[in-house]
């Protein structure tokens, strides 16, 4: 993760994505959607984190607001970093994984909202990335079934 850490520090500054704390050298790089759930190492799923937030979050499901923030990062910057360090962004995989994880959650499941903060899962207003058509055109087709 050293190339990611260096590139993210240069592009986004040496600050924890979650709490904004200034980061020392060698800070953790965190998987927003936990590696244990999705196994995605793409740049779209990675952020700089302080040791406190990284340890507190561990493998917890992040709050919707955190996923929103990570997906709202400048994609051109992530693509530029990807080319420079030869590391995939995997944004489509991150969106699909987040959609699948959150759609399968029961109401009020606890999610990690920051250091020692739990936010109950509530999708009263579904984020755009949870919609099946997010980021792509949808082809409409019709199928006729004839019973014989």
Which functions belong to the PLM regions below?
Residues 61-148:
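Extended charged
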Residues 1, 17, 31, 86-87:
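Sparse, context-dependent recognition of short Cys/His-centered cofactor- or disulfide-binding micro-motifs
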Residues 5, 47, 51-54:
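Generic hydrophobic alpha-helical scaffold/packing signal
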Residues 1-15, 40:
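Short, charged surface segments at domain edges that flank catalytic/cofactor-binding sites
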Residues 18-48, 57-73:
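Histidine-centered nuclease catalytic patch
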